[in-house]
Amino acid sequence: MKVLKSWLNDWIDIQDIDSNDISEALESLGFEIESRTDKVPNYKNIVVGKVLEIYTHPNADKVRVTKVDVGSKVYEIVCGAWNFDIDAVVPVALPNSEIKDGFKIDKRDIRGIESNGMICSASELDLWDDHAGILKLSKNTKIGSDFSKIYNSVDTLWEIGVTPNRGDCMSHLGVARELSSYFDKPIKSNDIKLSPNIENVIKVNSGRTKFCDSYLSVEIENFDITDSDIKIRYRLSSVGVRVINNVVDYTNYVLHDIGQPLHAFDRDKLFGTISVRKAKENETLKTLDEQTRKLSKDDLIITDNDSPIALAGVMGGYNTEVTDSTKNLLIESAYFDKVSIMKTSRKLNLISDASIRFERGIDYDIQHKGLERFISVFKHDQNINYSEAMISKKNTFSHENITFEKEDIFNILGVELKDDFILKTLSKLQIQSTLADNKISFTSPSWRYDLERPIDLIEELAKHYGYNNFNSTLPIGKNLNNKGEFWNKRNYISNLLSSKNFYEVQTLSFTDKEANSIFTPEKNSVTVINPIDQTQESLRTNLLTSLINTYKHNYENNTLSCKYYEINNVYDDGNHKLYKDIPNQEYSLGLLIPENETNPDTRGEYIQNDIHTLTNIINLLFPKVQFEKLLRPGFHKNYSYVLKLNN
């Protein structure tokens, strides 16, 4: 993710803090800095001008001659761009100035007409890559003013890595919250006062589905599709977003500003009540990319009078898109279930800035602020008529109060943190907390899904205390020469199976809940907190699924049919034998023998295996084992057994 210093300064006063110190702070707070760019453009003698006259060049048909008022004087300038007219407000490079790459601008003769400077494009000023024509500024911009004052020309851009559990940091506000604690500077309130002046035409509701907690909308009437404000275009371009027009740019701006995805509909193409539901099997929707998508019952959609008009949180529909002729808008701001959005975006290969933020978890209480922010930015651009927000909310979210002993901090960190530091740090992070009787109680804010256990808060305190402030200590442990009975048995099993041409595999412990229930329905799965892959939300209760998947993958990729074994942990939600409060885990041995095995010596004819091949191997491993018939759904009634050893 890319963040801009001047943009961060909207939320926290850091303009006077050296960019090197901010880089150090970001790394200390756990953000990997992937790149840094210091923007120091030279805008000497570049001012704001107004085009007074335009006429044809007497000796050239591909350029025009203009007269431009720069406040103190009117200059005659020859220009090759055709995207502006009389009264356009533009940046002007006067004689004795420099533009991008140190290119010098002076008076020059162009086919018999003296050109006193240059009217500039965004690309020529190194703002963003736009070669479509001259950069047009707001009509309200003061003529003759220094162009460098139009926006913060000296700036720093960081590209940082954000871990999957910190979806709240996928915005400038989120990063500013972290820096707020580090630099002990408050977050700016940026309160917005709005005065709606029209009534809502379209009704909205969040539907009966549990996958949409809130759905809000606001309507705008009789506006103009134009270029967005220069500051917005500069900021979006800097963070890698393509600028299009004011509507699209302002929705993208809110996304990168506070982390709330928005979507714009052409209100004149809507006819009834906007709602949210799961799609019907094989229902279709034509999306903005003009592709007709066949949907499944797992896809969450937005409907108008129950007809699909958008893929919730992923992509809008073609039939309700905003075009250059759009005059009335409906802006959507919603909270959609992150797992549902992830499944749809991955299945359809439609991954966007919005879907990524929904997947990682957005603030469930910021939807109204997203609409306010959009209206505020739009109002700055032009006079608009807008409604108050239409709100449909289920209020299904709440964060539990978590309590733990203060001594747990010392036991884990080895550092005695003072009460004042603990409370002050949590307050700056807007985490509600109390400290009494050596117990800390806290409730995480609506944007922090990663604070679910005491260890999460302790990690947060360690981060803001500063890992560089911890004293180095040598680890204390015992050096045992003997490997122990378990490892002796493990080595014996591994050596024996390897001698019988088995390949050992090591697979991840994550799986989906349904895979567990196939082979071990009697065991309850352990749910993974905040899984990186939402389809791998459980810990395995058996090794059979992973062995089958390994065989399938290897056979499909190299056509080898091999024998495999795995010795690894399996888990269930029972009580651990030694440790309380953690799930039960046990080592398990899994074997897989194909009916037709690739000959490891010749890679030629297959070796034929059957149930006796497997029982012979088991008897070698465990000579006193007993086989009892297993009757269970999903298992072959003649070839399934329970193995018993010493009863």
Per-range role (PLM):
Residues L179-G207, Q382-I409, E416:
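Terminal amphipathic helices with adjacent charged low-complexity linkers/tails
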Residues E24, R64-T66, F183, I187-T284:
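Glycine/proline-enriched, intrinsically flexible loops and inter-domain linkers
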Residues K2-W7, A81-V89, P164-F183, G240-A264, ...:
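Conserved phosphate/anionic-ligand binding catalytic regions in large, soluble enzymes, centered on
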Residues L52-N59, K73, W82-F84, P95-I99, ...:
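Short, glycine-/Ser/Thr-/acidic-enriched flexible segments
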Residues I54, S228, V248, D353, ...:
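Extended beta-strand-rich architecture
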Residues M1-K193, L330, K347-L348, D353, ...:
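Phosphate-backbone binding interfaces of nucleic-acid-interacting proteins
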Residues E34, V48-I77, S238, T251-N319:
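Conserved mixed alpha/beta core segments that line enzyme active sites in large multi-domain catalysts
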Residues R111-K136, F147-N152, T156, E290, ...:
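Mobile "lid/hinge" segments at catalytic clefts and subdomain interfaces of large enzymes
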